[in-house]
């Protein structure tokens, strides 16, 4: 099978080992650039990654894994969009990609906070699956998925070749996703 990197003990173990190894250096790199509130949220996430990575009951989907505007080609015909960069595809929560895309697409956290619930409602409604996947479940998956962009920013910043542009991009990703996770009280899922 082409999708071997899904919800598995191997993946959880890989990330659980990688995060504590790279996170302290990541914090040093971005000290003074990223808010202490986001660092504290990250500390809680890293310390409780085992709780975060527990598979919850409910539907799972194929996640693109890096769904941000840079990885979407918009096509005028039939109102379609083409998703690029599938190297991080995995099985995950149905709203992971939605949370990631929304968090990285708004430069103002207040604008994101004002818009996201209505965007998620519209997305959920378009799926026509209310009987099997309630909006409440989708919203909780969205809130939980708000950590995805932060985790991607931390891990990617520390494993790719370092550049000035990359440092800024990963800082912005971490900030936007971090503010989203804080606003949505995603830390409550770590208890």
Tell me what each language-model feature is.
Residues 43-50, 68, 99, 103, ...:
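Amphipathic, well-packed alpha-helical segments that form the structural scaffold of globular domains
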Residues 79-80, 87, 98-101, 108, ...:
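C-terminal structured subdomain/cap of oxidoreductase catalytic cores
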Residues 91-130, 146-168:
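Active-site activation/catalytic loop segments of kinase-like enzymes and analogous catalytic loops
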Residues 46-94:
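Active-site acidic catalytic loop and adjacent metal/ATP-binding pocket
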Residues 72, 132-139:
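A short glycine-rich, hydrophobically flanked beta-strand micro-motif that places a catalytic Asp/Glu
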Residues 1-64:
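ATP-dependent phospho-/nucleotidyl transfer catalytic cores
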Residues 21, 62, 67, 93, ...:
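Generic recognition of stable, solvent-exposed alpha-helical segments in well-folded globular domains
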Residues 40, 53-54, 79, 136, ...:
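Regulatory N- and C-terminal appendages and interdomain linkers associated
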């Amino acid at each position: 099978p082409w999708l071997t990197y899904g919800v598995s003990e191997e993946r959880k173990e890989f990330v659980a080992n990688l995060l504590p190894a790279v996170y302290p250096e990541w914090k040093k790199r971005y000290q003074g650039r990223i808010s202490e509130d986001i660092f504290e949220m990250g500390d809680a996430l890293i310390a409780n990654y085992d709780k975060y990575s527990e598979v919850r009951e409910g539907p799972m989907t194929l996640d693109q894994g890096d769904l941000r505007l840079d990885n979407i080609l918009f096509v005028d015909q039939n109102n379609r969009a083409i998703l690029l960069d599938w190297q991080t595809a995995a099985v995950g929560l149905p709203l992971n990609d939605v949370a990631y895309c929304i968090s990285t697409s708004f430069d103002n956290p207040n604008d994101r906070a004002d818009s996201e619930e209505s965007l998620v409602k519209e997305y959920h409604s378009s799926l026509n699956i209310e009987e099997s996947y309630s909006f409440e479940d989708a919203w909780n998956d969205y809130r939980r998925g708000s950590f995805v962009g932060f985790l991607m920013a931390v891990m990617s910043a520390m494993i790719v070749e370092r550049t000035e542009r990359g440092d800024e991009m990963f800082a912005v990703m971490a900030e936007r996703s971090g503010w989203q996770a804080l606003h949505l009280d995603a830390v409550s899922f770590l208890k």
